[in-house]
């Protein structure tokens, strides 16, 4: 009986200690996750062309749920006939053309873009992008989060 009582007492003390440490408000914060990996298949969204551009696009907002991320990193696939509508830019924004062809309007200029082109739009500029040809226009978009 003494052994059973000793075992029960030890178990009870251990359980109380475990519970008190588990629910202690003064626990150290967990370190921030060191990396995040996302696959485009998991985040793809069918969307109309942004900024009233029209047509069908697929948007990929990578790391949109990452806490305190200061950058926006997106991929957009513009299907034939679709566009990103002409709009005012409030922060630096980079478009990088992965594949396909398009026509970009930037302020008073209009010019062709293709795979390998990178376009930096500065604050206060306006721009839009129209897909051309039969192939999808695939771009990466990067800017500072608001």
Regions found by a protein language model. Give the residues of each.
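A short, N-terminal "cap"/entry segment at the start of jelly-roll beta-barrel domains
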Residues: 19-70
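Short acidic-glycine-tyrosine-enriched beta hairpin
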Residues: 109-123
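Ligand-binding loop in jelly-roll beta-barrel domains
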Residues: 67, 123-146
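Histidine-centered metal-chelating micro-motifs
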Residues: 83-84, 103, 119, 123-129
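Glycine- and acidic-residue-biased ligand/ion/polar-headgroup-sensing regions
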Residues: 90-93, 97-102
